[in-house]
């Protein structure tokens, strides 16, 4: 593990290649969020195809939900791919900017990461330039000055401060999205349940129409349980470092943060844009 001071972290994080990496990571996570919405939409259309007229041919009535379930699987795969890349890019950023086990990446892995960052940035140059110029205090929020320090810190203290900022932001964003997710989930289940109650469809049609959305709900439940478990481990690891600020505990906490980023539980980008400046100011004043 490299020993990085807060001054070194502040300078290193704003090097062009790291700004592009953070921008690419944000684009990947935002793309994952959008693909996840499309997957939900496909599942919902499949579920509500139960309203198709009885007079239609059986092939059409059963084929439409099957088709949309297949489309949902494609969007799910695209979601997972972008979550992977977003987490991978952030993992590289932290490893090299904070200085926690940067040697874990081979030369070929590093080349792939830099190529990915350049490809994403080149595809969105205007938005990319705005993002790398703006900080979290600006509108729209950018990726410059990703980590901020109110006082100079050395070694493990500086690294742990970066980790605390990651944990703090994640909790604040989670608190804002939970009510929306719960309301949306209950609404979907209630609407579909009511529809099933009032309609009389064959078992085959019912299974075809409901399978996609049921699997999607179980997938979301599974991912959120994983997310909660890792979050509890992160909180415990954070408390350990507050008592024993040692390198081995910082490395363990970072591995948990990297693991959580790879779980398909995403921020809501629309909320992040609205509250980023406010939360950035709040952390600066309270830290």
Language-model features, listed with the residues they occupy:
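Alpha-helical transmembrane segments and their immediate juxtamembrane boundary regions
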Residues: 29-83, 175-230
């Amino acid at each position: 593990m490299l020993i990085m001071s807060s001054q070194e972290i502040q300078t290193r994080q704003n090097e062009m290649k790291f700004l592009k990496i953070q921008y690419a990571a944000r684009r990947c996570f935002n793309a994952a969020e959008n693909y996840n919405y499309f997957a939900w939409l496909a599942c919902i259309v499949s579920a509500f195809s139960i309203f198709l007229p009885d007079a239609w041919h059986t092939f059409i009535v059963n084929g439409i939900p099957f088709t949309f379930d297949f489309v949902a699987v494609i969007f799910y795969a695209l979601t997972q791919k972008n979550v992977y890349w977003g987490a991978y890019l952030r993992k590289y950023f932290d490893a090299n900017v904070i200085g926690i086990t940067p040697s874990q990446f081979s030369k070929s892995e590093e080349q792939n990461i830099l190529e990915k960052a350049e490809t994403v940035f080149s595809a969105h140059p205007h938005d990319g330039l705005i993002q790398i110029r703006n900080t979290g205090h600006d509108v729209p929020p950018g990726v410059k000055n990703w980590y901020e320090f109110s006082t100079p810190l050395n070694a493990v203290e500086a690294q742990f401060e970066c980790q605390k900022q990651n944990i703090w932001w994640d909790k604040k964003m989670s608190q804002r999205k939970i009510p929306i997710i719960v309301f949306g989930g209950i609404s979907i289940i209630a609407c579909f349940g009511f529809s099933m109650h009032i309609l009389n469809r064959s078992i085959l049609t019912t299974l075809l129409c409901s399978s996609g959305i049921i699997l999607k709900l179980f997938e979301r439940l599974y991912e959120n349980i994983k997310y909660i478990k890792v979050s509890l481990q992160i909180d415990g690891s954070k408390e350990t470092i507050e008592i024993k600020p040692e390198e081995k505990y910082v490395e363990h906490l970072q591995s948990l943060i990297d693991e959580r980023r790879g779980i398909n539980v995403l921020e809501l980008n629309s909320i992040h844009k609205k509250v980023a400046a406010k939360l950035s100011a709040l952390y600066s004043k309270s830290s």
